[in-house]
Amino acid sequence: MPPRWASLLLLACSLLLLAVPPGTAGPSQPTYPGDDAPVEDLIRFYNDLQQYLNVVTRHRYGRRSSSRVLCEEPMGAAGC
């Protein structure tokens, strides 16, 4: 039988992993500095916004196209 401290350590680590909130899956949206913000802040905001939009709207390769028919033969081969 394993030592008692090993099982307590395993229990503590698993509870710690459950207690930690999960991270965000993507970047956070930049906050608008306001209409009366200096030009440098507005430039920084628009650059951050462009980078955010590039990440959020990037192409995701490996997904099936919606135009593909489910019953279609692979590689266009004729069925039996």
From Swiss-Prot:
GO biological process: feeding behavior; neuropeptide signaling pathway
Protein keywords: Amidation, Cleavage on pair of basic residues, Hormone, Secreted, Signal
Signal peptide span: 1-25
Pfam families: Hormone_3 (PF00159)
Listed InterPro entries: Pancreatic_hormone-like, Pancreatic_hormone-like_CS
Annotated GO CC locations: extracellular space
Any GO molecular function: neuropeptide Y receptor binding
SMART domains: PAH (SM00309)
Annotated localization: Secreted
Propeptide: 65-80
PTM sites of type Tyrosine amide: Y61
Similarity comment text for this entry: Belongs to the NPY family.
Function field: Hormone secreted by pancreatic cells that acts as a regulator of pancreatic and gastrointestinal functions.
Name of this protein: Pancreatic polypeptide
Species the sequence originates in: Gallus gallus (Chicken)
Taxon lineage: Eukaryota, Metazoa, Chordata, Craniata, Vertebrata
Gene: PPY
